[in-house]
Amino acid sequence: MTKVIWMKGGRFGLIARYGYKPIFQYKFRPFAQPGAEAADGGFTVLLYENGILSFSTYDANGLFLDELCFTLPGRVLQCFYSLLRNASSWLPSTPCDLRGSEPSLYGSSFAFDGYDPIRVFGMNALLCEPCGSAGGFFARHLYVLFEDVCNLFAEYGINMSLDGFSWSTARIQPFRKNQMYVSAPQQRGVV
């Protein structure tokens, strides 16, 4: 099972069995509606400093089901850090816990290299709050940053949204850990 170790100051620690530091994490977790079970346990997406993107799924109890990996070019890392630099005026002051005014059917967590992780409950409700409210302000900024990251991944065939993840097999092929991958014509490695 993959584990993230959070270090003081919000920095990512190493992930067990990988040896590379994650620089971005997004986790989606649907909650059970009253009187019913959640359909599934959601998913986690991790981008590592070596350009590997990991997509993991979970069952309704939150237990790990499967993991697929994708190789992204170095340009993705450069663009990602450019997005973080652009967010540096507001991201450090973002509360670690954002909640909408109504109970949510799902929760999300966002983590960016060098910043404390942010848990969001009811992103859609928060986006509807007035711009002058703290929740509305930070939710909008966080959502725009997330959309920018999604657009960056989409350039290489990865389609990610708040509640979904898919890929174009015509543009990118997943692999499993311990399989050989090719990240560039001159680089080869094993995850």
Predicted features, each with a name:
Residues 1-37, 94-191:
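Short, well-ordered, aromatic-rich surface patches in folded extracellular/luminal domains
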Residues 15, 45-48, 69-71, 110-112:
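Short, exposed beta-strand/loop patches in secreted or surface proteins that constitute
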Residues 27-31, 55, 86-88:
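Generic short beta-strand segments
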Residues 43-58, 106-107:
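A short, structured beta-strand/loop element
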Residues 55-68:
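Acidic/histidine-rich, surface-exposed loop or edge segments in extracytoplasmic proteins
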Residues 68-72, 118-121:
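Generic detection of short hydrophobic beta-strand segments and adjacent strand-loop junctions
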Residues 71-109:
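Short, internal acidic amphipathic alpha-helical interface segments
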